[in-house]
């Protein structure tokens, strides 16, 4: 976290504590911290104060921006921090916007973390004390290099999480838990918006040392056909063994992809 943003997060946390609440770093920041990586994902979650109280705190610290006030997400102008309140989501349709959102300042850390996609992204860190809150074994999965979904019901509500599993597997060279692969095989990706798919693909191609893992995991989850049919069609296409000891055109393409990532 940038020092300036960290100091602001601490100021927010101190004001929240004065009102009887707690402030946690959540999501990618905590994961990256434990992996020894620098993170630009600066997300904090405010527990134990009402939305109006939080708004008053933010107004006293700077120029508040409403990134989604109706579902408890704010910002401060000039700072790269996302400020959210605990919330629950209920799917009302198949699209990524088809959700009812319920803000609940007193939801508790367990239920708040349950809406996260993977255990490694469900950890929290108290901004003031540094305490790590890990309800779902994220630290252990991080040590083992495993991507495991937190909750099968919330995971299945957003099919983008299948692509996120493949993307994280490629970026971190992690494996995907068998139960997560099995769940992902049942999910329908055809409803996803093109730009959401391309965003995950871009991360895999530009941030992973071995982007082939993204496509290999998508194939393992039986999810290549809907978005990457042209790659599926390469599987089993033979090449002259004399010139291509790596095997079929699929293997050749994956090797070329990984070589390109080194450039």
Residue ranges and their predicted role:
Residues 1-263:
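Catalytic cores of the polymerase beta-like nucleotidyltransferase superfamily
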């Amino acid at each position: 976290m940038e020092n300036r943003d960290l100091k602001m997060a601490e100021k927010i946390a101190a004001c929240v504590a004065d009102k009887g609440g707690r402030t946690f770093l959540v999501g990618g920041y905590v994961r990256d911290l434990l992996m020894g990586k620098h993170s630009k994902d600066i997300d904090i979650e405010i527990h134990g104060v009402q939305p109006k109280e939080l708004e008053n705190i933010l107004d006293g610290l700077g120029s508040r921006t409403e990134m989604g006030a109706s579902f408890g997400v704010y910002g401060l102008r000039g700072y790269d921090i996302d400020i959210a309140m605990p919330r629950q989501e209920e799917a009302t349709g198949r699209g990524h916007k088809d959700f009812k959102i319920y803000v609940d300042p007193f939801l508790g850390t367990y239920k708040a973390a349950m809406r996260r996609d993977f255990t490694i992204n469900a950890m929290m860190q108290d901004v003031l004390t540094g305490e790590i809150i890990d309800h779902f074994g994220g630290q252990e999965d991080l040590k083992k290099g495993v991507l495991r979904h937190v909750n099968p019901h919330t995971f299945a509500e957003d099919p983008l999480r299948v692509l996120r599993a493949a993307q994280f597997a490629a970026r971190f060279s992690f494996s995907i838990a068998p139960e997560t692969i099995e769940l992902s095989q049942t999910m329908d990706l055809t409803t996803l918006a093109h730009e959401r798919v391309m965003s995950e693909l871009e991360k895999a191609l530009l941030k992973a040392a071995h982007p082939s893992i993204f496509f290999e995991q998508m194939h393992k989850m039986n999810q290549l056909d809907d978005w990457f049919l042209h790659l599926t069609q390469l599987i089993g296409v033979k090449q002259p063994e004399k010139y291509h000891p790596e095997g079929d055109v699929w293997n050749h393409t994956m090797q070329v992809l990984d070589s390109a990532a080194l450039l």
